[in-house]
Amino acid sequence: RGIRVILDLAMNHSSSSHPWFQQAAEYLKSLPEGAEPDSSECPYVDYYHFSREYQGGYAQLDGTAWYYEARFWDGMPDLNLENEAVRREFEQIADFWLDMGVDGFRLDAVKEYVTGSTEDNVEILSWFADYVHGKDPENYLVCECWTDQNTYAKYYESGVDSMFDFAFADKSGIIANVMNGKASATSYAKNLETEQGMYAQYNPDYINAPFYTNHDMGRSAGYYAGENSEAQTKMGNALNLLMNGNVFLYYGEELGMKGSGKDENKRAPMYWSKDGNAEGMCKGPADMDDFRMKFDSLEEQQEDPDSIYNYVKQVIRVRNQNPVIARGTTAYLEQYSGEQCFALTRSYEGSNLLLLGNTSAEAVSVDLTGLTVGGTTAEELVLLGELYTGEETAERAGTVVTLPAYSILILGEE
């Protein structure tokens, strides 16, 4: 099917059981009291950050007076990516997988390469991006930098292809806030427009990487409660999938899987079947809580035309049928947007379309008088896609479009 495969690559840290760390630890334990480590005797001692003094984010090396940097957990010591020898190791690792046919990497925890220094982290990413793209410009790099939007925008200067767009993700992100009524519908469209300049100033060739949830976040189905929760879950997925760039979808979001609290719950196994003994089913992480899913399993949702699964399939189909959605530039249409409805255009190489969305529980009418999309008036625009979470459908009367609750309309030139 032409599916490209990328692998998760954690360059920030290794396991404390890794031979590099084990050899460094044994060497430090063997040093006479007061002696300084010598990398000519053990090169691996410079693969990590060791210190005689405790610092925040450091753990004590058992049986010694030494401490080592371990930002996430004492079982995951941080690597010294400013060490050329460590860089050569990761070039060999990249070679191994790229030569095997992998198409790129998701780079984990890039803001912790040198904690607190965006400048140093950008330099490290520049080295790796140059190396990977030097092997093949089509090799793809997307980075996880869980911080504010202004900061992760700066990482585009490194030449990596994509940064995960955290501003729209998680229960406090733009999408969930809009769908919960904590933010206006216009904030979705307006932020899509403004972030383009924010990223392009660092890399004009950037490719956005929208996502809604990941393995460290609560499942999106848990963001909503009440009688409209299924509709909100559906449309939240649509707002993610209709962003431009390379969109990422965490497994199980297309089912409305449940999972929050500790990490094990967020990583519950795919809900293939309600029969726990069915093929493909597994028990999940040992420390995962015992909880029931909010919505049906995949095998049940496949048979239900109104399920979250079939809704998400429809959104993806609309996206794939209209490449301008992924590739185009967004323009926010303030005149035609409001608290409960957004209007935006997406344009790419002479192709243009209009996205209208109602993020509320009530029908909303929008008068598009005066609007032209690529030279086509509102009345002449043709239907390219319609996404409904209920039985009601949109109505068009001249320049007036009435959108039912939690719905999206995609219109374009004939």
What function would you assign to each model-found segment?
Residues G101-D103, F211, T402:
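Short loop/turn motifs at secondary-structure junctions
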